[in-house]
Amino acid sequence: MAIRSIRKYGDELLRKKSRKVEKIDKRLLTLIDDMFETMYNADGVGLAAPQVGILKRLVVIDVGEGPVVLINPEILETSGKAVDVEGCLSIPERQGEVERPTYVKAKALNEKGEEIVIEAEDLFARAICHETDHLNGVLFVDKLAESEGN
């Protein structure tokens, strides 16, 4: 396992759309391990592959309920709304209020290639939305609440 360098705000790669993961192989499993180590080292709760320079649809999340791997995640359903403060490991100097759903149902593959369906609430739901945005080249600063201004 290795700590990878996190791309920072202004890096063009963070604005690109990630490609679907076609196969789960040793390289991808190593990337997953590295992403968890990088995220934990930076005291984060989520990390998307583009943040470490890889344009693949892969995110890792741990909001305190254990590590979760989402390969090719797809949000199926959302409900509720809440505005809360978010930060991002790629924009360490900034936080802001972002409106997100309070409930998310998503499907993805896990690291074994099995399809999983996750129902998440509150911080976990927020993390899934935030990290999935990264896969589409969207950063939390693009979604700041009206009161924050852009």
From Swiss-Prot:
- Cite the entry's keywords alphabetically: Hydrolase, Iron, Metal-binding, Protein biosynthesis
Q: What is its EC number?
A: 3.5.1.88
Enumerate the GO terms in the molecular function aspect.
metal ion binding; peptide deformylase activity
User: Which coenzymes or cofactors are required?
Assistant: Fe(2+)
Coiled-coil regions, chain positions: none
What protein name does the entry list? Peptide deformylase 1
- The positions flagged as active site in the entry are E131
Pfam assignment, any one: Pep_deformylase
Q: Which family does it belong to?
A: Belongs to the polypeptide deformylase family.
Q: Which Gene3D superfamilies match?
A: Peptide deformylase
